[in-house]
Amino acid sequence: MKQAVFITGAAAGIGRAVALEFAHQGWFVGAADLDEVGLASLKSEIGAERCFTTALNVADAKQWDKALASFWKASGERLDVLVNNAGILSAGAFHEIPLMRHQAIIDINVSGVMAGCHTAYPYLCKTPKSTVINMASASAMFGQPGLASYSSSKFAVRGLTEALDCEWAEQGIRVKSIWPLFVQTNMVVGLDKLPSVKSLGIKLNVDDVARAVWYAANDRGETSPIHYPVGLQTKVLNLAIKLSPAWMSRWINQRMSSEH
C-alpha cells in the first residue's frame, strides 16, 4: 500500500516543496492550508488521484479532527508521516510589535503543532514506523533579537519534539524537527534589514529544506538524531553553540544581530 504524508502550510513555500518531494517519491500526499487556490494548484500538479487537499487553520483543534479523519479515509487508512510546517513570523523590536501579533505567532507556531501532534496520535499509532516532522528553525538554537516571539515559538517546538520522541518511542513513533536558517520564501520578504539577515544572508531555498524533510522522515536508525540543521551555515552555528561557553554563545548571537 502506498505510504502517506500529511503536510500543513502546503499551498506555497517550504510546504509545497515538501509535498512535491514526497509525491515525486511515489507517496500519497495530504496537503492542508488556508490558501485554497494554492492547494488547488498543487493538487493539479501532483494529480487528483495522488493528492488530498483540505482547508485548515492549524490552531483550531476541531478543524484538525475533521481534516485528519477525511485524510485517513482518502489515504487508505495510513499516516506514515505528519509534517507540521505551517508557521508565521513578524520581525522587529519586541516592544514595537503589537501583543496580539506575538500571541498569533504562538497560536500558529506552537498551539498548531501541539494540536497536530495530539490529533494525529491515534492515526500514527495505527501506522507502523510512523514519523512526525516538526518545522523548527535555527532560531531554536539561541533566542534571536528581532525575532523574539518567533524564536520563542521554535524553542517550544524543539522542546515538544524532544519530549514526544521519548514519550512515543514505545509506540514506534519517531518525532523530529528541521532547523533551517533563512529560506527564500515569502516569509522572509522585508527581512533584508534585519541585522542577522545582513550578517548571514539567505542561502537556502525550499528544495534544500524539502530534501532535509525527506531524509529525516526516512532516517529511522536507532542512532538517528532528533534535530536536523539544514545547510552548512546552520550546522556550523549549531556546533559552535554546542561547544562554546554560554558567554561566547551570547557574544556570537550579539555579533550576528548587531547593526555594526
Predicted regions and their residues:
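Canonical Rossmann dinucleotide-binding motif of NAD(H)/NADP(H)-dependent dehydrogenases/reductases
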Residues: M1-F28
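Active-site helix of classical SDR
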Residues: C117, S153
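Conserved glycine-rich Rossmann-like NAD(P)H-binding loop of the short-chain dehydrogenase/reductase
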Residues: Q25-S41
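Substrate-binding pocket helix/loop in short-chain dehydrogenase/reductase
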Residues: A93-F94, P98-I106
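C-terminal helical subdomain
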Residues: S177, V197-K235
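The beta1-alpha1 cofactor-binding region of Rossmann-like NAD(H)/NADP(H)-dependent oxidoreductases
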Residues: E36-V37, A55-K66, L99
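Residue(s) in the substrate-gating loop at a strand-loop-helix junction
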Residues: S137
